[in-house]
Amino acid sequence: MDIEAYFERIGYQKSSNKLDLQTLTEILQHQIRAIPFENLNIHCGKTMELSLEDTFHQIVRKKRGGWCLQVNHLLYWALAMIGFETTMLGGCVYVPSACKYSNTMIHLLLQVTISGKTYIVDSAFPFSCQLWEPLELTSGKDQPQVPAIFHLREENGTWYLEQTKRQEYVSNQEFIDSNFLEKNTHRKIYSFTLEPRTIEDFWSISTYYQVSRTSVMTNTSLCSLHTKDGVHGLMGTILAYKKFNYKDNIDLVEFKTLKEEEIEEVLKSVFGIHLETKLVPKCGNVFFTI
C-alpha cells in the first residue's frame, strides 16, 4: 500500500509537511470530495470487506467508495502513515424512528491530537451530516461549518454529536414532503466515547449489517459525495443534490427520480463509480436524510 497512491486518489498535492490543523483539514476535505460514502457492494451481491488491504484495493486502486468501516479505516491509515497521532473510536448512531441511539457501536470515527489539542475527524457519514472540518473536542461550543453548525456535548464520559441546519428550499414541489428531507432544524447524529478501538471491534457488526433484513444497509442502496458547495446523494433510484447556503441562509435541495437504466451512467458521471456487477437499487425505510 502506497501513501502517494492514496494522495493521488483524493487529488491531494501536499502544500507542506507540517502535521498541523490546516494539513488535517485539507486531507479531510479532499477525501470527502473524492471518495463516496456507499454500500453498493451489498446490492451487487458482493461483501463489504474490512481488512485494510481489501479496503485500499477497493477505494484506491478500483476508485470506489465504501462505508464508515472502510472509508474512515483508510483515513486512519493515511493519517497515521504521515505521522498524525490518530485513534479509532466507536459511535452509536441516533435512530430517529426509535428516538434513541443504537444499542451497539456501529460507526467508526477518528480522534486526532495535534500539539496537545484533540479533534474529532470523520469522513464517512452520509449527506449533510458529514463534517467538512475537524471538530474541536470541546463540550457545549457551536462550531459553524459549511454544511451546518455542529455541536459536541459531553455527559458522564459519553460525547454527543449534533447539528443545527439551515432552512431548505425544495425546487421540485412533488418532493416537498419527501421522507428524505430532514424535518427538524436540530438533529442528533451519533454518540461516542474516547475508548480506543481497533477494526476488529467492528467485524461482527459489519457482518450483521450486511445480512440482516432489518439493516438500513440491506434495505437501501446509498451513495453520497461532497462537492465544494454541496452534496450529491443517491438513495435507491432517487438522486438528490443539496447546495449549502445558496442564498439568505437557505439550502437548495433538488430531487430527481431516475429510471433504473439511468443509474449506471449517474454513478459514473456524478460519483465516479464504475460497477463490475449489476446493481439492484433498493430503498426501504428511510434512515438517512439529505
Curated annotation (Swiss-Prot):
GO cellular component, one term: plasma membrane
Active-site annotation: C68, H107, D122
Enzyme Commission identifier(s): 2.3.1.5
Entry binding sites for substrate: I106, H107
Enzyme class: transferase
Biological processes, Gene Ontology terms: L-amino acid transport
Gene Ontology MF: a single term: arylamine N-acetyltransferase activity
UniProt-annotated binding residues for CoA: Y208, T214
Superkingdom of origin: Eukaryota
Keyword tags: Acyltransferase, Cytoplasm, Transferase
Compartments where located: Cytoplasm
InterPro entries: Arylamine_N-AcTrfase, Arylamine_NAT_domain_sf, Papain-like_cys_pep_sf
Reactions listed under catalytic activity: an arylamine + acetyl-CoA = an N-acetylarylamine + CoA
Pfam families: Acetyltransf_2
Similarity-based family: Belongs to the arylamine N-acetyltransferase family.
Function of the molecule: Participates in the detoxification of a plethora of hydrazine and arylamine drugs.
Protein name stated in the entry: Arylamine N-acetyltransferase 3
Lineage: Eukaryota, Metazoa, Chordata, Craniata, Vertebrata
